Amino acid sequence: MLREEAAQKRKEKEPGMALPQGHLTFRDVAIEFSLEEWKCLDPTQRALYRAMMLENYRNLHSVDISSKCMMKKFSSTAQGNTEVDTGTLERHESHHIGDFCFQKIGKDIHDFEFQWQEDKRNSHEATMTQIKKLTGSTDRYDRRHPGNKPIKDQLGLSFHSHLPELHIFQTKGKVGNQVEKSINDASSVLTSQRISSRPKIHISNNYENNFFHSSLLTLKQEVHIREKSFQCNESGKAFNCSSLLRKHQIIYLGGKQYKCDVCGKVFNQKRYLACHHRCHTGEKPYKCNECGKVFNQQSNLASHHRLHTGEKPYKCEECDKVFSRKSNLERHRRIHTGEKPYKCKVCEKAFRRDSHLTQHTRIHTGEKPYKCNECGKAFSGQSTLIHHQAIHGIGKLYKCNDCHKVFSNATTIANHWRIHNEERSYKCNKCGKFFRRRSYLVVHWRTHTGEKPYKCNECGKTFHHNSALVIHKAIHTGEKPYKCNECGKTFRHNSALVIHKAIHTGEKPYKCNECGKVFNQQATLARHHRLHTGEKPYKCEECDTVFSRKSHHETHKRIHTGEKPYKCDDFDEAFSQASSYAKQRRIHMGEKHHKCDDCGKAFTSHSHRIRHQRIHTGQKSYKCHKRGKVFS
């Protein structure tokens, strides 16, 4: 009896161990989460809840109304565990709780622990099913005995009269630290914010020492009282979890697609469509303060700004080349790896860029979404349209400060600058020739291997690169879409038109250092330079004849093959050379484009006009070495 009084005095001195004042049911202590709230808890918070539920039900299972309750109190010091003090507390009250079966609760605890471990092993999300099963044990008793006092109320009187004793079983060492860590993690990680219509749970401050209970109560109250901060921009609906917001967006946006009225492209968010629509409207709200250039996206402005600052933060680990954009670095890396992740489903051709695949796919579909407003011609790629619009004088022109040559886009002039800077990074290992771009080296390499992957479906002729095939196809179709605004002459390719325009402007930016002769294009200068060096790089494999020009080599080959690809529809006559075909066409059509400036006489060919002009000038260029006589 004295021992019991001493134990009672020690218990009263300990802070927070006073018995509860007033009636408290078991339901008030057993905190429950709804399914929506449960999904918002992270694994550490769920583990904390599990520990609380198991602790409560184990204590409930251990209560024996008619027996004594043994209590062990563990205390710790800085040096370690101290001696265990054991006391006996006899129960003075006895409560009859009917035929409630404590063994049933024990089985539910075992099933709950087993199911929890199975869910963890199978990486499944723990559900509330087993937790509800525990509280259902008391609910089922109440339904079976409607005449008796609710079991939860009776358990509340019995169970909570010993709550201070049960609290002593909670260790203040390792487990306490782990739970405290879980609570700290919960306060930092918890993002679920929700206003609940359910009544708030109030509990006496005397239970603050019950660490599990107070921690879970705090967690529960935070879930209830915080605002919803995750809002869907499309529907305006708010959520207390980012995961719930994502699920909502998938459901809401899954059936709601935004389609572009111009090109038919579909987007799942309205802001993406608005951004895309600027491509068609030409709207560019973002302006560079340095040069005044405008952009349709803020990210493009940020990337452009690095051109002024010279910042290139992205570096290739293979060749140390630096880039101003991360996307350019990723694209460049594929040169080293040889990766071509974008594959055509029709012909299985692979590409390094998604844009190249998109443009290539239009070859199969025949789609040409980019239309010229001047002439109505449509193109499969936007860059091709921009290049075409230069014919009409549309768009910004870029002028080279060194040779004053004009270009239709910034990329072309950047490549042109390398001519003056002699920046040639790519070298052919076979002949030692340098190239400004890797694509040029790839095309050049085919001259050594003899590879000609591009084939004409009309005549079966093959070519080293696609551009040559495109130019060749115009021979069969007769199409000449490029027209000179000065004289009305038409051409099959834009490069031919550019060369022709130099006749009217008189512009000849390329000068020969040997003889001072000037030319309107670099290729003509390179061809002329072979006259001084005597270089003849093109050799006939049949007769070993060499040529200084590739075109002469190609024309010569037809002597051996007998090929005559140029056919006159009027007289069913074929020619091996395009010039012969064109001359014959003028004869049939009566066209005489070449006019003498002195007498006004017109001729069908340029060579005929030159020969005629010698009559006026008196020039006699051809001399007989045997007799010394000269002729015009």
UniProtKB/Swiss-Prot annotation:
There is a cross-link at residue 220 (Glycyl lysine isopeptide (Lys-Gly) (interchain with G-Cter in SUMO2)). It holds the Pfam family KRAB. GO terms for biological process: regulation of transcription by RNA polymerase II. SMART domains: KRAB, ZnF_C2H2. GO terms for cellular component: nucleus. Residues 24-99 form the KRAB domain. The keyword Ligase does not apply. Disulfide bonds: none annotated. Keywords: DNA-binding, Isopeptide bond, Metal-binding, Nucleus, Repeat, Transcription, Transcription regulation, Ubl conjugation, Zinc, Zinc-finger. A zinc finger (C2H2-type) spans 230-252, 258-280, 286-308, 314-336, 342-364, 370-392, 398-420, 426-448, 454-476, 482-504, 510-532, 538-560, 566-588, 594-616. It is found in: Nucleus. GO terms for molecular function: DNA-binding transcription factor activity, RNA polymerase II-specific; RNA polymerase II cis-regulatory region sequence-specific DNA binding; zinc ion binding. Belongs to the krueppel C2H2-type zinc-finger protein family. May be involved in transcriptional regulation. This is Zinc finger protein 860. The lineage of its organism: Eukaryota, Metazoa, Chordata, Craniata, Vertebrata. The gene is ZNF860.
